[in-house]
């Protein structure tokens, strides 16, 4: 009877793991490299309270609507402010947004709990889930890791620049590897 119960539990775990994106844990150094490449660095520190509007026309529309857009960026004073501004942008139809320290794209990875994009622990878990799905789809390689920043396989040079930044961070040569493209 015990064997049957244990077997059922293991079978259930395997079934759940197949659909679950967090059954593989990315190494911390990889998640650290993602954050290093994605997060806006100000005064040597990561500023997690950032919204990036990806499309030029949407950034212009947001600026015209009164948002404090500088280029494509909106800097907020806190995660609460960022959550409110992100919600207002989304309500206005602007959804192609990269949010928080891991610059997770709302359009492709929507989460109604917007504050979680700006909180390091929950954003890190979401970044782990995104990387896990990419690895399951494309295998574990530098090219796959480069897809975190820019999914398009047609823009291989952009992906390559990104994973080279990650590589430099991981292997200690990060003098010119800060910031996202």
Protein language model annotation of sequence segments:
Residues 18-181:
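Catalytic glycan-binding domains that act on GlcNAc-containing polysaccharides
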Residues 1-4:
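Positively charged n-region of N-terminal signal peptides that target proteins for export
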Residues 8-18:
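Hydrophobic h-region of N-terminal signal peptides that target proteins for export
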């Amino acid at each position: 009877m015990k064997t049957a119960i244990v077997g059922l539990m293991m079978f259930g775990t395997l079934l759940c793991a197949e659909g679950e994106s967090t059954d593989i844990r990315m190494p911390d150094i990889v998640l650290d490299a993602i954050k290093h490449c994605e997060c806006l660095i100000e005064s040597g520190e990561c500023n997690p309270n950032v919204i990036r509007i990806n499309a030029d026309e949407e950034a212009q529309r947001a600026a015209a609507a009164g948002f404090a857009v500088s280029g494509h960026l909106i800097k907020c004073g806190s995660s609460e402010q960022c959550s409110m501004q992100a919600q207002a942008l989304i309500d206005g139809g602007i959804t192609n947004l990269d949010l928080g320290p891991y610059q997770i794209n709302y359009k492709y990875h929507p989460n109604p709990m917007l504050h979680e994009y700006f909180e390091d622990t929950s954003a890190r878990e979401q970044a782990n889930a995104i990387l896990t799905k990419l690895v399951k789809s494309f295998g574990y390689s530098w090219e796959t890791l480069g897809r975190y920043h820019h999914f398009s396989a047609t823009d291989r040079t952009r992906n390559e620049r990104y994973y080279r930044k990650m590589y430099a961070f991981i292997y200690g040569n990060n003098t010119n590897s800060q910031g996202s493209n």
